[in-house]
């Protein structure tokens, strides 16, 4: 997939992140794309739902609904931030072959582990994603630390 397509889909993930922020949550968004079409979208809703597990990628996968293994094999998941251990586990479990991330400076999940298991990682290193997280962490450091388990 061409870089500009990745940027377009990442912009949808950014929209999800901004939606989460407007709702009072953590600004991380995700979309699941199959054959050039978004089939799932989500954002971190741990705060909004009082959930321990509703990270953006988990919300996105949940909203995509049940899919066959062959469907996941044709997907790309986009996340505004490097996926954590839990979300990486779901990506590996369902065999999603490609993960496109907005940035990994704020938080770097188990990217090497993903690569060792055959996942292709593309880091767009977008200033917009970094700024969104920097601003959020400056405003709500305690909530951010809770989200990453610190």
Role assignments for model-derived ranges:
Residues 1-20, 73, 89-150:
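Zinc-dependent deaminase
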Residues 22-25:
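A short helix-loop-beta-strand connector motif used in the catalytic cores of GNAT acetyltransferases and
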Residues 57, 61-81:
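Mobile, glycine- and charge-enriched loop segments
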Residues 54, 77-97:
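Local cysteine-cluster metal-coordination motifs and their immediate loop/turn environment
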Residues 45-58:
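A short, polar/charged loop-to-alpha-helix boundary motif
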Residues 28-36:
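Short beta-strand scaffold segments in enzyme catalytic cores
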Residues 13, 17-20, 30, 56, ...:
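Small-residue (primarily alanine) positions within well-ordered alpha-helices
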